[in-house]
């Protein structure tokens, strides 16, 4: 499962750039802290837990068991706290007038809004009182289906304030997906908006909510944010104007003391088949881990402006737009738009405008902007940037090098972060000031994380440093999910059933001679060609390393002789025309980069790839098309541009 050879752009170790002598951790400190976090987790996390304010301090730290049939995860279990107090109230004495949230609207002509910690406190308290007025109590579930607007942050923190459990459904999801999630968690209330602007278009959130609620209990109430002023239908007795109510309630709402193990939120994993899988994160451990990873991974310092470009509908937005930054008293940026609207300079214009210090985005965005050319980056002053981050999928070395050269100017460490919805925060990542990097490698584990590489056939732990296999984690960390909502058996079976005694990430990895980890993609994104196992990420990296390729996605398809063949979807750089000669050149290129075994059997030119709004490529759809089995693609309304699917079907290479 993995690399048969290294792409030409993934060479050398990159030493820590100058200027990071005062980072939170240098190499020696990282090793010392990491060793303690494994050898004495109670002492290590007992100390780190004190970064939060506790109503009742904990006396117990770690109480976890990975034994199949008895899986139980508890951290700080006798402590009592409130997440909203840690994200707001405790900052009011010293930073009431500091900006907590910068809101950058979709339309660049609209002014940005700066929301201070004082204003955030008032808005969250008012929204909490609105929730109480609607009969929401501790433990009740509230579904949030909102655009990337400040009200989404207010809603999350208002739920946390009164002990309600929020479940955000990404604003690009269909009415069916929304209804499934409302029903699965038994939500009493949905918070939505009239419409959601994004890239100059509008998504009809209220209409989608109306359609979803036809399939839910008639007792579910609906709070509506009138965001754009677009005309919407109104169901009297069910729908309530949220902003109007907020003006007519008290700006003070006492926080509800919560046990550390009380659920904070449920987040449904996207793209799962069958019944949605509600990942449960609890209050104490999750918040400690989100705050600590935000501080160390990005070398966050007081006064920094932090921008994570994700949507709050994904875990990245939960941990690194809201909970991590606000627990640390940071200024966090919420961006309603997309990287290419109104043009390919939008990200960089926002960085310049708000003097962003840490910038955290997805490889798919970097590759899309690569394809537009570096001139869009060079138009803007990015001298404020200190740390660059990558999240969501393995970053191919070509994109890493471009990001480093044009965005970071060779001066910003790149933190390529491996983690998951289920992990709550970073698992394997470089730390600025501590970790020399390699383009395409997630490098070293975060504090408290014990990765192991197992043989996928025998499930035996591989002892050699240099090896390849499936990535598992051998012990718990505070940010770990606790269960699947309403289905603990499914939780145990999914994550602890296949490799007993370990948490199974579902990803393959390679560990190199320096002990660095390279994520090779989901184990179900592994192609077995003539008995050779190969991670799709490596073939994609080789293709994207070609100077005329902007993006590539690789899947397997049934092959009469090899068992599986390699099917590549390739998006070319702007201005490059597809041709048979170029197709042959790409096959030759991959043979040179990786080896003959990795040669693509079929290459389809793809002006666009099917992606979720968070930028993840939906390889499930690509596999179906490659297999010439596109009759049951399922719900594609969650894609950023569903239209690309028909184009891919029409131009498929593997016709029966």
Curated annotation (Swiss-Prot):
PROSITE patterns: AMP_BINDING. Belongs to the ATP-dependent AMP-binding enzyme family. Catalyzes the conversion of acetate into acetyl-CoA (AcCoA), an essential intermediate at the junction of anabolic and catabolic pathways. AcsA undergoes a two-step reaction. In the first half reaction, AcsA combines acetate with ATP to form acetyl-adenylate (AcAMP) intermediate. In the second half reaction, it can then transfer the acetyl group from AcAMP to the sulfhydryl group of CoA, forming the product AcCoA. One of its GO terms (cellular component) is cytosol. The modification N6-acetyllysine is found at residue 616. Its cofactor is Mg(2+). InterPro entries: Ac_CoA_lig, ACAS_N, AMP-bd_C, AMP-bd_C_sf, AMP-binding_CS, AMP-dep_synth/lig_dom, ANL_N_sf. ATP binds at residues 392-394, 416-421, 507, 522, 533. The keyword Lyase does not apply. SUPFAM superfamilies: Acetyl-CoA synthetase-like (SSF56801). Its EC number is 6.2.1.1. The gene is acsA. CoA binds at residues 198-201, 316, 530, 591. Acetylated. Deacetylation by the SIR2-homolog deacetylase activates the enzyme. It catalyses: acetate + ATP + CoA = acetyl-CoA + AMP + diphosphate. Keywords: Acetylation, ATP-binding, Ligase, Magnesium, Metal-binding, Nucleotide-binding. It comes from Rhodobacter capsulatus (strain ATCC BAA-309 / NBRC 16581 / SB1003). One of its GO terms (molecular function) is acetate-CoA ligase activity. This is Acetyl-coenzyme A synthetase. Mg(2+) binds at residues 544, 546, 549. GO terms for biological process: acetyl-CoA biosynthetic process from acetate.
């Amino acid at each position: 499962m993995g690399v048969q050879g290294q792409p030409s752009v993934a060479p050398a170790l990159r030493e820590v750039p100058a200027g990071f002598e005062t980072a939170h951790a240098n190499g020696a400190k990282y090793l010392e802290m990491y060793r303690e976090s494994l050898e004495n987790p109670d002492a290590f996390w007992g100390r780190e837990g004190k970064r939060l304010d506790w109503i009742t301090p904990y006396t117990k730290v770690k109480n976890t068991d990975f034994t199949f049939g008895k899986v139980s995860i508890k951290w700080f279990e006798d402590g009592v706290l409130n997440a909203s107090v840690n994200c707001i109230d405790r900052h009011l004495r010293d930073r009431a007038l500091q900006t907590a949230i910068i809101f950058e609207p979709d339309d660049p002509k609209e002014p940005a809004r700066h929301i201070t910690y004082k204003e955030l406190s008032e808005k969250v308290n008012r929204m909490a009182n609105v929730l109480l007025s609607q009969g929401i109590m501790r433990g009740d579930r509230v579904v949030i289906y909102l655009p990337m607007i400040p009200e989404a942050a207010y809603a999350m923190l208002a739920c946390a304030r009164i002990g309600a459990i929020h479940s955000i459904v990404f604003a690009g999801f269909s009415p069916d997906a929304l209804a499934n999630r409302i029903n699965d968690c038994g939500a009493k209330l949905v918070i939505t908006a009239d419409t959601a602007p994004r890239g100059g278009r509008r998504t009809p959130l209220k209409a989608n909510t109306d359609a979803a609620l036809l399939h839910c209990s008639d007792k579910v109430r609906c709070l509506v944010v009138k965001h754009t002023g677009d005309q919407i239908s109104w169901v009297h007795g069910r729908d309530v104007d949220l902003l109007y109510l907020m003006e007519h309630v008290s700006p003070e709402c006492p926080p509800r003391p919560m046990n550390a193990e009380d659920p904070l939120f449920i987040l449904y994993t996207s793209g799962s088949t069958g019944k949605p899988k509600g990942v449960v994160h609890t209050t104490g451990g999750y918040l400690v881990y989100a705050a600590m990873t935000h501080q160390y991974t990005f070398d966050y310092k007081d006064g920094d402006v932090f921008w994570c470009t994700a949507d709050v509908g994904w875990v990245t937005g939960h941990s690194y737009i809201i909970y991590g930054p606000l627990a640390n008293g940071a200024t966090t940026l919420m961006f309603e738009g997309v990287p290419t609207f109104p043009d390919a300079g939008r990200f960089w214009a926002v960085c310049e405008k708000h003097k962003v210090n840490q910038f955290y985005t997805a490889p798919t965005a970097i590759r899309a902007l690569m394809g537009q050319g570096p001139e869009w980056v060079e138009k803007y002053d990015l001298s404020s940037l200190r740390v660059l981050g990558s999240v969501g999928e393995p970053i191919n070395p070509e994109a890493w090098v471009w990001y480093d050269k044009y965005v970071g100017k060779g001066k910003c460490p790149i933190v390529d972060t491996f983690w998951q919805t289920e992990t709550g925060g970073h698992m394997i990542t470089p730390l600025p000031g501590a970790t020399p990097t390699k383009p395409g490698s997630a490098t070293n584990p975060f504090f408290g994380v014990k990765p192991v590489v197992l043989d996928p056939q025998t499930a035996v732990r591989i002892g050699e440093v240099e090896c390849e296999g499936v990535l598992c984690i051998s012990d718990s960390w505070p940010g770990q999910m606790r269960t699947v909502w309403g289905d603990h058996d499914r939780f145990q079976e999914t994550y602890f059933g296949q490799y007993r005694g370990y948490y199974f990430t579902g990803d393959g990895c390679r560990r190199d001679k320096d002990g660095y980890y390279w994520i090779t993609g989901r184990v179900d994104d592994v192609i077995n060609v003539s008995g050779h196992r190969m991670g799709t990420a490596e073939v994609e990296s080789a293709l994207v390393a070609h100077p005329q390729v902007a993006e590539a996605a690789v899947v397997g398809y049934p092959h009469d002789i090899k068992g599986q063949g390699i099917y590549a979807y390739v998006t070319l750089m702007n201005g490059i025309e597809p041709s048979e000669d170029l197709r042959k050149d790409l096959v030759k290129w991959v043979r040179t980069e990786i080896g003959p075994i990795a040669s693509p059997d079929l290459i389809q030119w793809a002006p666009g790839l099917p992606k979720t709004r968070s930028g993840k490529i939906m390889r499930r759809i690509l596999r179906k098309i490659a297999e010439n089995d596109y009759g049951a693609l399922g719900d594609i309304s969650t894609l950023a541009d569903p239209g690309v699917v028909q184009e891919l079907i029409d131009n498929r290479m593997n016709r029966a």
